[in-house]
Amino acid sequence: MSASDKTKLCNKGMSRTSRTTTFVITPAFRERDDEGANSLCKAFLNTFSNLKSGMFKCLLGVGAVGTFISTFPQFFLLPCLLCVRCVCVCLCASISYAASAIFSFSIFFFFCLA
């Protein structure tokens, strides 16, 4: 990923960095906690190379709905929540149906090792 791509990723809040990986910071999250959003973006860039097989290290500064890392196609998103002082691997799956926003659900798995 080039420096230009990294800058676009942070500034635009949403960017496809590969065929199957998406990073999203919603405008609402950015307005509510701009510092947290920027920290999250930096954390993501620092751990990008650790994304393997749909499993990734939790990123410090996460904690708002709308912040996603996706290792699946368009409608499969992986939200990762705050993990502090532990080696944490989050395997999270959120399935949203395009036909109806009413029918959507999320499944979260958190594995934290001291």
Curated annotation (Swiss-Prot):
Source superkingdom: Eukaryota
Bilayer disposition of the protein: Multi-pass membrane protein
Primary location class: membrane
Location of this chain's protein in the cell: Membrane
Keyword set, alphabetical order: Membrane, Transmembrane, Transmembrane helix
A GO-annotated cellular component: membrane
Keyword Transmembrane helix: yes
Transmembrane segments: 58-78, 94-114
Protein name per Swiss-Prot or TrEMBL: Uncharacterized protein YFR035C
